[in-house]
């Protein structure tokens, strides 16, 4: 194998073996001209989750209230931010009659309106909690692998919070996971940083195998020049120069995202392949194999990436797709969808979230439904030259 694990104190750390390609790197990063082409299938994957996270947050709040329902007056002080709009939760929830219902209770001799879950929503929430309990060991391993990608096996807790929804972690994972697994996780505050960091307490070499290595090994290939699955949007025309470059780039040595990259020259295609590998692995750690680009913006130092590292998303449109839906850029791993709108391998939590999304569209006034599924203005495809 390219990488070996060696023991240090108090943890195990990674060390790069000096192979011929590592000693003879050249600044070979090629300027290529690529164009962004709209992928309607993957855009629909992003668009169908409009407002899902906000709805789920309020659903959790109501389901955990010991009174069974939350008084509307309490919701009035918690405005939601939906893009550029600030919406009162009570008004927002009543858009989804299949999930929420309004009822009045007598309190202190007067009527007090409250928001409750519908019976169907309550049953689905109970099923979700059951799946979360069953999936807990796997979710713990996902979080451990995320930290193993980072230098010193630690990330700012705020960064983990931003990724927690995409990774399927429960909203109270600080309590349900971090406190319940002290032998894996610890909170630290570095001397030169005011932020709280989440640190992995123990390195596990069994987890330090990337998804690409697993799939390649299952296919009978055990070399070090692993190729990424590539799939382009229908109608995407790859110029000959770009095609030749991509073919050569795929044959370059593959650097595990869990390995120490300090000996790699950031000006080389070998280093760029390592960056692609890091985000390929990170997206595989998410449930939907996607995340907002903004969630990755503060990962440069922890993941030991060069400046302008996110340009790999534009340079490799056959591996990643940048969706512009919902007013944000979302990075989607193409291979996970196989050219369609559905994940090839679907986690049970994804299926539950899809049922929530379907219930959000049930029983709504037609004008609201049309507004929910209306597409944003088309973004014109353009050719852009990405320079080193």
Regions found by a protein language model. Give the residues of each.
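Long amphipathic alpha-helical repeat/alpha-solenoid cores
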Residues: 2-388
């Amino acid at each position: 194998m390219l990488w070996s694990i060696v023991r240090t104190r108090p943890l195990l750390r990674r060390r790069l073996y000096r192979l011929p390609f590592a000693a003879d790197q050249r600044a070979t990063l090629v300027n290529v001209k690529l164009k962004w082409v709209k992928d309607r299938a993957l855009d629909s994957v992003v668009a169908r989750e409009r407002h899902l996270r906000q709805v789920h947050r309020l659903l959790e709040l109501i389901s955990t209230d010991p009174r069974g329902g939350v008084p509307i007056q309490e919701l009035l002080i918690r405005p939601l931010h939906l893009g550029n709009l600030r919406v009162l939760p009570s008004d927002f929830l009543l858009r989804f009659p299949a999930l929420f219902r309004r009822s009045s209770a007598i309190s202190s001799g007067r009527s007090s309106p409250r928001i409750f879950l519908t019976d169907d929503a309550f049953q689905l929430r109970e099923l979700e909690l059951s799946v979360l309990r069953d999936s807990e060991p796997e979710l713990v391993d996902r979080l451990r692998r995320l930290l193993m990608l980072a230098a010193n096996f630690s990330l700012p807790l705020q960064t983990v919070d931003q990724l927690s929804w995409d990774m399927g972690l429960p909203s109270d994972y600080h309590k349900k996971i971090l406190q319940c697994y002290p032998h894996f996780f610890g909170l630290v505050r570095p001397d030169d940083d005011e932020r709280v960091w989440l640190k992995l307490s123990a390195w596990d070499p069994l987890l330090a195998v990337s998804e690409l290595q697993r799939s390649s090994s299952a296919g009978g290939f055990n070399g070090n020049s692993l190729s990424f699955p590539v799939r382009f949007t229908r109608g995407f025309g790859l110029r000959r120069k770009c095609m030749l470059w991509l073919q050569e780039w795929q044959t370059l040595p593959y650097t595990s995202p869990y390995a120490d990259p300090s000996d790699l020259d950031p000006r080389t295609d070998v280093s760029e392949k390592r960056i692609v590998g890091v985000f390929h692995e990170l997206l595989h750690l998410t449930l939907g194999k996607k995340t907002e680009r903004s969630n990755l913006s503060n990962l440069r130092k922890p993941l030991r990436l060069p400046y302008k590292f996110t340009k790999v998303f534009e340079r490799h449109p056959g591996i990643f797709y940048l969706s512009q839906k919902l007013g944000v850029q979302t990075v989607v791993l193409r291979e996970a969808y196989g050219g369609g709108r559905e994940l090839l391998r679907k986690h049970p939590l994804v299926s539950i979230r899809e049922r929530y999304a379907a219930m959000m569209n049930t029983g709504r006034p037609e004008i609201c439904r049309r507004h929910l599924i209306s597409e944003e203005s088309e973004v014109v495809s353009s050719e852009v030259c990405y320079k080193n």
